């Protein structure tokens, strides 16, 4: 029955996947806090104008992928396809401009109506950071360094490569736009319909096309990095010099552009070859005009977002395992309440303790093995009378009788 299946492009995260998912999020939060970033939580839907004004009316996100609906009040609302615009809106409405620079971390679901495939869902999850209010290129370096440290903390840093490019300032992009239009106009017959439309409205988007014919044309296109003015070159040199000083390796990718209109100057991606077509696991850049475009004062910003699902897939070989619990086993029905009390006390002490609710001693032991328990704590009438329990090591099969007064200390060996 179709109604019993998840909606196309969505996914149920059962315990093992959910554990890996949360591990990515919590690791990201920990690393972000190490860099001085505080968590921000924004709504999963915004007024449609928040995205339509900022992402660009020629972007695939706005023209093809947004989940937009009209609510009962007649307002046009959109499930967030990304969160930089939402964070920027919160920066303005929350009055955070008084305290720049502001460092913000976020996590949560995003929504895009894309063709579902491995590593690409219609409801997906991201972690991300935004550093708002710093125009120094070292802010870009710090944001990239945070991303690099996160990948390292997840154990996948050695399987990713940092790609870097400069989109320059508006003056540089305008000079490049003229050169690019001239080149692409000579290859109209080879461009896809989408790219022909982009050529008229926003030619830089042609560089981001995934169409094979477009890619062949783009391979011979002039490079934006060759059209940077002196100020843009100096800014980019500050970024590359900072990365070199921190020992963060990178590759210059002259065709790298961001798919959203608000980016300028630094653009970057951490890419892997281990996930096939969905090789970008983290992407970001600088957006100095976004806050003003949304109605705030001129305020620079830089940030990135990373796909939780893709990072989790990349970590699959090193899947985060569940803590092996201890199994609390009452020997019989008369021992259940006391066993539950003991389990409760051990949990309050920080131990992972499972308690089964039915079955004789043999069936409860089978359950302990099925859940991969590290040890079984057996409590019967004799043990209750003596203030002891029997602790059985389920790996070795050895068991000992232990007094309750020293039980927590004894169980520490199984952690």
From Swiss-Prot:
Family the UniProt entry places it in: Belongs to the class-II aminoacyl-tRNA synthetase family.
InterPro entries according to UniProt: aa-tRNA-synth_II, aa-tRNA-synth_II/BPL/LPL, Anticodon-bd, Anticodon-bd_dom_sf, His-tRNA-ligase, HisRS-like_core, HisRS/HisZ, HisRS_anticodon
Main location (coarse class): cytoplasm
Source lineage: Bacteria, Pseudomonadati, Pseudomonadota, Alphaproteobacteria, Rhodospirillales
Keyword field contains Nucleotide-binding: yes
GO molecular function: ATP binding; histidine-tRNA ligase activity
Annotated keywords: Aminoacyl-tRNA synthetase, ATP-binding, Cytoplasm, Ligase, Nucleotide-binding, Protein biosynthesis
Family matches, as PROSITE patterns: AA_TRNA_LIGASE_II (PS50862)
Catalytic activity: tRNA(His) + L-histidine + ATP = L-histidyl-tRNA(His) + AMP + diphosphate + H(+)
GO term, biological process aspect, one: histidyl-tRNA aminoacylation
Signal sequence, renumbered to the chain: none
Enzyme Commission number(s) of this protein: 6.1.1.21
Known partners and oligomeric status: Homodimer.
Top-rank EC class of the record's enzyme: ligase
UniProt-annotated location(s): Cytoplasm
Protein known as: Histidine--tRNA ligase
Superkingdom: Bacteria
NCBIfam families: hisS
Stored CDD domains: HisRS-like_core (cd00773), HisRS_anticodon (cd00859)
The UniProt record lists the keyword Protein biosynthesis: yes
GO CC terms, sorted: cytoplasm
One Pfam family cited in the UniProt record for this chain: HGTP_anticodon
